[in-house]
Amino acid sequence: MSTQYETQGYTINNAGRRLVVDPITRIEGHMRCEVNINDQNVITNAVSCGTMFRGLEIILQGRDPRDAWAFVERICGVCTGVHALASVYAIEDAIGIKVPDNANIIRNIMLATLWCHDHLVHFYQLAGMDWIDVLDALKADPRKTSELAQSLSSWPKSSPGYFFDVQNRLKKFVEGGQLGIFRNGYWGHPQYKLPPEANLMGFAHYLEALDFQREIVKIHAVFGGKNPHPNWIVGGMPCAINIDESGAVGAVNMERLNLVQSIITRTADFINNVMIPDALAIGQFNKPWSEIGTGLSDKCVLSYGAFPDIANDFGEKSLLMPGGAVINGDFNNVLPVDLVDPQQVQEFVDHAWYRYPNDQVGRHPFDGITDPWYNPGDVKGSDTNIQQLNEQERYSWIKAPRWRGNAMEVGPLARTLIAYHKGDAATVESVDRMMSALNLPLSGIQSTLGRILCRAHEAQWAAGKLQYFFDKLMTNLKNGNLATASTEKWEPATWPTECRGVGFTEAPRGALGHWAAIRDGKIDLYQCVVPTTWNASPRDPKGQIGAYEAALMNTKMAIPEQPLEILRTLHSFDPCLACSTHVLGDDGSELISVQVR
């Protein structure tokens, strides 16, 4: 049935041709997107569907809270460790555990490492090919590519011979007739605007980033034992420090600390001289995308804040990445966020495949219920082979979180906007410099292109914080402060009979919160509200659409059968790239299939 209504400044109209892109994600989770387009190929309705049930909240009930981090860490292998961090924060908050300064520092090093790694992988491996036309790189002149690269930075891998070798590798790859992971790209699509030389440079850096990302995560291996899924502990960090090598075998020693320093230096070098120039190059040739994909970013954004500089202090003055919320586009009034307040964060399920006693009322995570109820309602196809969702009913395995009743965007763009408008000096300088270099107004950052630029900015910011926290750690060690964990309240006998806590941080993709309740030494309730829950949110009882859905509205598609515009905007949020993408007509007939191998 055709419907039309107004919400959040958009006119939702599900008449017209229906396209289905399914799935959109790679690695963690699965996502489906459906849009309606009018006769001018403009998106008039967008529907975001999470197609996988997680259920870890149910698995955790009755378990030892000290083990929760090891379970929830498996929510995601890409932003590895961040769920464990939120979990230990929550359990420590519940029990009243204070961690040593070194533990806080190392946790921040782990998080900053993740930000650098995740943003690099997203920029090149997950979203890069939405902007870089791989096959067009074959037309490039390696000498002109070298001139371009050397004009942008002092990165040593920029000689004509280097780019000739990269181009020759690509040429042999193409001539072999098996493009592998590049086989099903929309190469030649009219939205690809980079010249051949910039495409060759971008492709070369894609390969370099693929290799270098393996180096960054060695920091996790030093302090957490491995990557992905490094080790953590309630009360601190599990890594002993043995500077003079007189203590525990396998503890962190000077050799490993020197390795960490060398990786930090090389990470900052790569981000400053490769990623930042590449992001600006993409921006320079794609300025119209500074007006596409705005979505909720000019209305409602949210950040919890992260990187406490003072151990056990999560107040505004301690958090190096500021937190706050903006609603109704009032960026002059950044509101404080209280994750314990039952009126602030609430989750709704009236359009999700869950049920509450009253589906029209949202529930705070401390009162959360995870009761799966797969009931797709009146859909085209069948319950097990849905050809077209019915967004007027239930249509996603993702709940709809709201902050004071508002759908919110979270992630690098939201964080950058909040930090900028709270006057964070480093953010203001970085953003102004990038937008000035592109000759774009500040409002241009509230866009699909802006999300790409904000990730580059954050990677650079995080690299600086890596060095900052490592220097703090080394100062402590030189002063004889080696403690990395507190075991004072390790035993359940020291805990209250009943207690509850909240742990929050900022994952690369956005605001992350874990809420835990403990009774008689066991987990009685556990709820996670993750970044993708916010951004991929379905509708709520008011009909408000989520961040993904809003960002797609009013986007004009050049070739609907090649939905590059949809992928660019969705990938700008970093929901992970598609393993396979199918575009379907409104009768379920397949128009085009893209399989990324």
Swiss-Prot record:
Residue ranges the record marks as coiled coil: none
EC number: 1.12.99.6
Subcellular compartments: Cell membrane
The record's free-text note on cofactor binding: Binds 1 nickel ion per subunit.
GO molecular function: electron transfer activity; ferredoxin hydrogenase activity; hydrogenase (acceptor) activity; nickel cation binding
Chief location bin: membrane
GO CC terms, sorted: [Ni-Fe] hydrogenase complex; membrane; outer membrane-bounded periplasmic space; periplasmic side of plasma membrane
Any Pfam family the entry gives: NiFeSe_Hases
Cofactor: Ni(2+)
Record membrane topology: Peripheral membrane protein
Top-level EC class: oxidoreductase
Positions of transmembrane segments: none
Protein keywords: Cell membrane, Membrane, Metal-binding, Nickel, Oxidoreductase
One of the GO BP terms on file: fermentation
Quaternary state and interactors: Heterodimer of a large and a small subunit.
Family as reported in the entry's similarity comment: Belongs to the [NiFe]/[NiFeSe] hydrogenase large subunit family.
Classification via NCBIfam families: PRK10170.1
Function description: This is one of three E.coli hydrogenases synthesized in response to different physiological conditions. HYD1 is believed to have a role in hydrogen cycling during fermentative growth.
Name this protein carries in UniProt: Hydrogenase-1 large chain
Source organism of the structure: Escherichia coli (strain K12)
Lineage summary: Bacteria, Pseudomonadati, Pseudomonadota, Gammaproteobacteria, Enterobacterales
